[in-house]
Curated annotation (Swiss-Prot):
Positions of the UBC core domain: 2-148
Family: Belongs to the ubiquitin-conjugating enzyme family.
Species: Saccharomyces cerevisiae (strain ATCC 204508 / S288c) (Baker's yeast)
Lineage: Eukaryota, Fungi, Dikarya, Ascomycota, Saccharomycotina
GO molecular function terms attached to this record: ATP binding; proteasome binding; ubiquitin conjugating enzyme activity; ubiquitin-protein transferase activity
Protein name (database record): Ubiquitin-conjugating enzyme E2-16 kDa
Residues found modified as Phosphoserine: S12
SMART domains in the record: UBCc
Function field: Catalyzes the covalent attachment of ubiquitin to other proteins. Mediates the selective degradation of short-lived and abnormal proteins. The RSP5-UBA1-UBC5 ubiquitin ligase complex ubiquitinates RPO21 forming 'Lys-63'-linked polyubiquitin chains.
Pathway(s) annotated for this protein in UniProt: Protein modification; protein ubiquitination
CDD domains xref list: UBCc_UBE2D (cd23792)
Amino acid sequence: MSSSKRIAKELSDLGRDPPASCSAGPVGDDLYHWQASIMGPSDSPYAGGVFFLSIHFPTDYPFKPPKVNFTTKIYHPNINSSGNICLDILKDQWSPALTLSKVLLSICSLLTDANPDDPLVPEIAQIYKTDKAKYEATAKEWTKKYAV
């Protein structure tokens, strides 16, 4: 199956069975460039926020993972100021059996359960580990400022 057929199938599957609190689709006519949105999980400091992501599929998708970046600023130990996401399935744990829907759900999980032991932003990870209340307060503040 060509990458464009696979991406079109995932788009149709997403339309039929969208993951909870996520949406995604192509930007204009470009099947290889999508925009997604994730609602901040209610049990996280990101509750009430809507976070936008940019998704670029490589031409050899699904054999290579999509490039997914936050375009909304977010305070998180695994997401840096450029919107890069530290998530194993977007790197060495990628498998062609994974879909964009599963990727979005994994990113949602990351918002609820950060991984401070594999941080992209060590300073935030340190605050997360030593002063969780301060971390949550700052994350809520950023959510209000950038994602509401």
